[in-house]
Amino acid sequence: MSAGKRSAAGSARSDTATSTVDLHASLLPLAFLVGTWRGEGVGGYEGLDGFHYGQEITFAADGRPALGYVSHTWWADEPRDGREPGSPLATETGFWRVQPGEDGKPVVEVMLAHPFGIAEIYVGTVTGTRIDLDHNVLIRTATARDVTRSVRLYGLVEGCDLAYAIDMEAEGKPMQSHLSARLHRVSD
């Protein structure tokens, strides 16, 4: 990837193999995420039967120093527990941004909100096309489930698919695998 012209707004054109979008210069380490991704994943947790889900994630750049982020998931298993294939499961919205770290390496900050009463801030690192995130702050409403910590790993696999894994500590149970998926790019 190469950074091209800079505009007066402080953004750079990111010339990637899959997209050319107005991308703020601070977001160049995340340029590989920009676009819409779609695929399938598996989920589970202690006390919860395993399940399959479909997902679409969009990372959008508009020239400002944060990527907009929206994720939608839907049931992709046989009918169970009142769920039918295609019925909505979860939504996340938020922003991803990059700040300079004390050691000069980029620090990724992710702010997410969920309709079930949780807002999260993750802080982590980006190394090439791998992003490691750990909870920095988690805020819950009085009626939200008792999630206490989460870690996420995102990265490109086999050159072009976006894969991730989310581990979670909740309801007094230890940190364990919760969700993982592999998504392919469907648009820039």
Swiss-Prot record:
Q: Does the keyword Translocase apply?
A: no
- Gene3D superfamilies according to UniProt: 2.40.128.20
Q: Which keywords does UniProt give here?
A: Heme, Iron, Isomerase, Metal-binding
Kindly state the positions of the motif GXWXGXG in this protein. 35-41
Record text on cofactor binding: Binds 1 heme b group per subunit, that coordinates a highly solvent-exposed Fe(III) atom.
Q: Name one Pfam family in it.
A: THAP4_heme-bd
Catalytic activities: peroxynitrite = nitrate
List of residues binding heme b = 178
- Which family would the database say this protein is a member of? Belongs to the nitrobindin family.
* Comment text on domains: Forms a 10-stranded antiparallel beta-barrel structure able to accommodate a hydrophobic ligand in its interior. In fact, this fold hosts the heme group, which is located in a wide surface cleft.
* Subunit text: Homodimer.
Provide the protein name: Peroxynitrite isomerase
| Species annotation | Frankia casuarinae (strain DSM 45818 / CECT 9043 / HFP020203 / CcI3)
